[in-house]
């Protein structure tokens, strides 16, 4: 019976997402990373970060990877941006309220249905599967997957950051890293809060970044929203061995990045990601395979 219910859950997930078969091969010009790590920072405009001496590590990453100079959040305040990135919809949420609960398809449910894996690693989460609204400097509004927990996202995918593996080959296919509000640039005034967030990222993830250089792994760093302006201009950057270094001026938003993740893994499209263009212009060509014996 449990097996039948699991099959029905997968069918339901796929039937309410786009029509593409789950796990289909990516387009020939797209890579398929073994791992993607997405780091969410908070409430800073593009001009607050790029070129700012208070963010030396992030600017180093931007210079070695793909920097999107016209990247935008999709709403204010924070929570609808996280929901949009995770599910292709703000779910009609216009505040940072807690708790909310949703039952439609999302990035994690599609990954699981196609045989891939997903986890969120949140700083100050007190225990795996914690569904409370806050703990210390953790806020549920920054952890979108928990809003589907127990529906189509298992509690085992909702983890404290202390569970981020030291053996990076054990990372899930896609993971979200959520610093607490002291370390994601949310709390405090610039430049101190920016410097603190930059230092946290270097301290906690530079070992992964250096490992990813020689492995098929992709880091994405983005901001949920800017400081509340109508423009909502934020920084987004991709870093990894498959990424072609440069500054890219095509307009993107959270739906564009979600669309790209779905396309990398051949997953059905979600909500407004179907109307977004895939980011298909920042990738190194695949390495040519050596010719075999004749």
Predicted regions and their residues:
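Positively charged n-region of N-terminal signal peptides that target proteins for export
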Residues: 1-4
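Bacterial N-terminal signal peptides
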Residues: 6-16
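N-terminal pro-sequences and low-complexity stem/linker regions of secreted or lumenal proteins
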Residues: 21-294
